[in-house]
Amino acid sequence: MPEEVEEVFSSLRQRFRGDLLRPGNPTYEEARAIWNGRYAKKPGLIARCRDVRDVQAAVRTASATGILTAVRCGGHSLAGFSTCDGGLVIDLSSMRKVTVDAQARRARFAGGCLLASIDHATQQAGLVFPSGVVSHTGASGLVLGGGTGWLTRRFGLSCDNVDGFTLVTADGGVVRCHPHENPDLFWALRGGGGNFGVVTEFEVRLHPLTAVTLAQGLSCEADIRRVLEFWRDFMGNAPCDLKWNIELRLAGNTTDLPDELRGRPVASNSLVWTGATEAGRRHIEQALSMCNPHSVSNRVISYLDLQTMADSCFPHGKRYYSKSGYFRYLDNVVIDQLLEAVIALPSADTQIELAYLGGASSQVAAGETAFGDRSAPFIMNLLASWPEADADDVHISWARGLFNKLRPAMKPGVYVNFMSGDEQDRVPEAYSTRWDRMVAVKTKCDPHNLFRLNQNVPPGTCTTQRLRSEQS
């Protein structure tokens, strides 16, 4: 690997406009850090690209040498795919330009943008791009994997709102992908992750929105069953303007909480209404009436405030692990299992996230994008979070154990952005009937699997055994 790194460095240094960072460089340590602290890896070389030509140069050199290559946009990969040990990281974090056409309600943004970059630019025109819920997330990884957030029920997945991509493929060429130009790649990039190349620009549709109604409240342990049963049945007929997420977690020990809640299991309810304020008030009041909530807040906030309110809950450097799946229906047996699980949470930062999709995201035809099955409305994410490596085993074992217990009730399928790095066997499950088409596109555009640090769709000639050894 050191010889490969030296070969890559020597090849790039005369024609690369950005920064080439190696161990010992003053900014290397900061540059190699990613969001998930479980993956404190040490790349042999970080190529921080300034423009598309830099990306092309890095990709061509990586392809020619065969060096292990990761692509970093926001460095927010839950599975740690934004980095690697000893190899090359193609870093797009300096490429964050956003251009908004307010009249056409369109935007173009570069591959290194964070959600915050896009939100601030589009809000100046009173517009939004439907994305995730943590503003320091990289937009590329989110969008390419699908992209869910507060606006999913109203406007669809992030990938549903993309009209075009500019892609650097494994041979270093630049291609445009639109419905009528490279349509197979356009299809695959909407949900297929980073398998097909490095996206340097996205062309997206925007929607008018500047403020939302946000209601939040904590339901105590005795009320959790009733809340889940009501939520399960209520959301199936709820307007698309309403997004109601529930987190089952342990309440903090802060003085602003009643004594009976501190450190105890709670259902944390967050309801976001994106339509007319008065209509939203009625729906939110109906929902809250069944929650018997404590510490209630119900207010109109700016969209930018909505997009940053969870940032501090998911800081850089903590350790994260998740297991996720879909349900057609949350039957009472599943609810019983969730109630047992919340009592046994390994730490206060670990939670069971529940969301109801449906709405606009379910109205896209099944084969229109590479994104997995949209027919199951309930999505669950078992997200373990902790600060120190000595607690890895207890948190990872908790997530795996609960997932295995719930798995028989789940519908086959998984959202790739919620997958951890040890779930390569579930990737075909994520894409289901789209798998063969995905493999065909991958085989054509990346036959040697240069872009393999992702939830990988191997080309037709790449064996799963080889793939796993290369990712380890």
Task: Identify the residue ranges that each predicted region occupies.
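Soluble FAD-dependent oxygen oxidases
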Residues: 1-472
